[in-house]
Amino acid sequence: MQIDRQGMSVLAEDECFELLDTMQLGRIALTERALPSVLPVRYARFGDGSLLFRVGDGAILRAAQMGQIVCFEADSGDHTLERAWSVTAIGQLTVVADAGLLAQAEAIDLVPWSAWSNTFVRLAPQVVNGRRLGPVG
């Protein structure tokens, strides 16, 4: 097990994806009007390993239309925060436009937050990092 300089366990990429599969809520960090923005999103893993989001007309859709490089983050911890984990995935955000991919996306149980969240976008991670926090020793 690798430990970083802050004493946190560094997770292997497969561990990161296993943890992401246990959650449905994360955050996307993107650039909006030349400023950083962090927005909550529901997500699911797509068949090819990418992350799938269902969004409405807003900053995330605009970022996907521009093919922006974004950072996604999800985490979890117990109520005392004695044990927690965090996973980040960095990559290009794109709109799912291919008919075959859209059919696959529709088959995934990704409940939208609103009736206007009807566009699928996906993040193909190029860099995946994770850390696990816990008691030392």
Where do the model's predicted regions map?
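Extreme N-terminal tail/first-helix region
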Residues: 1-21
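Short beta-strand segments
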Residues: 23-56
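Short, surface-exposed beta-strand-loop junctions and turns on beta-sheet-rich folds
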Residues: 34, 59-61, 137
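A structural signal for short, well-ordered beta-strand segments
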Residues: 43, 89-93, 123-125
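Structural motif
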Residues: 49-50, 69, 92, 127
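Short hydrophobic/aromatic-rich beta-strand segments that constitute the beta-sheet cores
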Residues: 52-54, 72, 130
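Short, structured beta-strand-loop surface elements
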Residues: 57-118
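Short, active-site-adjacent segments that bind or coordinate small-molecule cofactors and metal centers
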Residues: 108-137
